[in-house]
């Protein structure tokens, strides 16, 4: 009896630890969302009435809006995205599956809101200083974001909102799992590599147009390969059943 009680105590301790980690992650995510609003509020007093909201590949503003929109549109989007991603496990038809991927979903949300927070800082500084931005560096940041997603997505369970959602992954759970285990290192290592390549090209004096071209080719590759892989795995599974 004492051994059974000890086993239950260990399980309870592990569950409490997981819950505490989940709560800490959720708190960090909420702080990131609130931080984007605080950045806008602090910058409001220093920003002109009309501010840039879009920059061309040369880093120069090419579209403007009142500062209420320029400073608070991204925080508003960030908040809406937080609510949407938070409630995904509750509205997804496969919500029982997603309950086993809460940590993975939290990591994906953490990376997403972290990316939006960096963009908010980047654009707000440009608004306050009335300076051009360096669009070359955004490619490195987004590449690292994909690397982060790759690291997080390996264990995400089948669902309709997050992950590699193709007709073949959604119709076969094994194909879903294999596709994500395949895609995870692909995105992680190539994301780090693309971030380094973007930084090197910028350092060597190549313009944003060249870096954008390389970046888009990379995006196409890391999107097409998992789709093709999921189709290949689906056909293999179908043949094995026949």
Kindly label every feature range from the protein language model:
Residues 141, 210-226:
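Small-residue-rich transmembrane alpha-helices that serve as helix-helix interface/gating elements
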């Amino acid at each position: 009896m004492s051994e059974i009680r000890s086993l239950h105590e260990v399980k309870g301790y592990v569950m409490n630890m997981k819950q505490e980690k989940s709560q800490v992650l959720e708190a960090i995510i909420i702080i990131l969302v609130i931080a984007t609003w605080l950045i806008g509020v602090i910058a409001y007093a220093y920003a002109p009435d009309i501010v840039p909201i879009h920059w061309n590949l040369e880093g120069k503003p090419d579209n403007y809006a009142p500062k209420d929109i320029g400073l608070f549109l991204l925080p508003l989007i960030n908040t809406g995205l937080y609510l949407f991603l938070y409630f995904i496990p509750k509205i997804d038809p496969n919500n029982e599956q997603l309950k086993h991927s809460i940590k993975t979903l939290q990591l994906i949300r953490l990376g997403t809101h972290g990316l939006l927070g960096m963009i908010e800082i980047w654009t707000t500084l440009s608004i306050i200083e009335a300076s051009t931005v360096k669009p070359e560096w955004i490619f490195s940041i987004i590449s690292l974001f994909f690397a982060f997603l790759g690291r997080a997505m390996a264990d995400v369970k089948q669902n309709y909102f997050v992950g590699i959602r193709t007709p073949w992954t959604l119709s076969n759970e094994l194909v879903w799992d294999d596709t994500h285990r395949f895609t995870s290192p692909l995105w992680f290592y190539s994301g780090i590599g693309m971030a380094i390549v973007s930084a090197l090209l910028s350092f060597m004096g190549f313009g944003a147009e060249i870096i954008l071209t390389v970046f888009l080719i990379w995006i196409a590759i890391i999107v097409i390969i998992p789709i093709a892989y999921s189709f290949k795995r689906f056909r293999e599974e179908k043949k094995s059943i026949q």
